[in-house]
Amino acid sequence: MTDKELKRSVLTVTAFASFLTPFMGSSVNLALPSIGNEFGVNAVTLNWIVSSYMLSTSVLLLPAGRVGDILGRKKIFTAGLVIFTLTMILLTFTPNIKWLIGARVIQGLGSAMLFATNLAILTSVFPPGERGRAMGINVTAVYIGLSSGPFLGGLLTRYLGWRSIFAFLVPMGIISLILIRTKMKEEWAEAKGETFDWQGAVIYGFSLAAIMFGFSKLPSAAGWAITASGLILMPLFVMREKRTKYPLFDITLISKNRVFAFSNLAALIHYAATSAIGFFLSLYLQYIKELGPRDAGFVLMCWPLTMALISPAAGKLSDRQNPGVL
């Protein structure tokens, strides 16, 4: 396989996989009222359908990326896609809300493995001068998933029921696995032979889980206590990573690399400001404004559709202009 063919194959596979998780997320947000009506649960319980997935993904994202560096990014990427697809089958036939939330936790593991290795594979294949365009295409796939999710998810929910959203994604996951098997022949393991920092991973996982779970319980006393315990563990994680030879996360990237630090800060602000919109706006449009899933989907698809249209040009332009200015 030539270098050009490898780049095309990797970009196709990663973009296809990048479409799946945001499509699922935006579709599920739209289906929440229908899920609540079927299982007879309130908005607090419905929130755990989203939060359980996000919590699992967040806690496992960093360890999954490190394991990918050691064992091979393609292996972790493939395993993540297998888990993600299998949980879609479980979610299609879920009998109750507990089963649904549990399957979403497992699905978060698969999603973490996909997210942690997706862009890492791209940066391993594409040189610096071509990465902006490649990442722009990849991000476009993400926002196509976000924008088409409300529309198609609304149609599926209205005419076939909310379970059809998960069933719809099963063949797409299988197609992605076939593409990996036939098109992605290389493997990337830049930290092969290094050890995995299990202690750091445990501290990091408990810290982040406590912070996120504690926030969900605020302003109760238990919520403050759980959040405080998570915040206390975070400095311990930093000290652990500074001492170990092969850290889970290189802390010096934040202190010495301003571009890395501020780009991640910008991403944090962006996603913190927008991640809750899909959840609350979906409930507002369908419960308060009494819109159907299809019409609510049209409203929810506007902002990600705009991003999907702009991302390719922005990525290509970042190869020529200062990304900081953009």
Model-assigned labels for residue ranges:
Residues 1-182, 302, 310-326:
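Transmembrane-helix bundle of Major Facilitator Superfamily
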Residues 9-20, 28-30, 160, 222-223, ...:
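12-transmembrane solute porter fold
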Residues 44, 204, 294:
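Rossmann-like NAD(H)/NADP(H) cofactor-binding core
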Residues 158-265, 270:
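Hydrophobic transmembrane-helix bundles of small-molecule transporters
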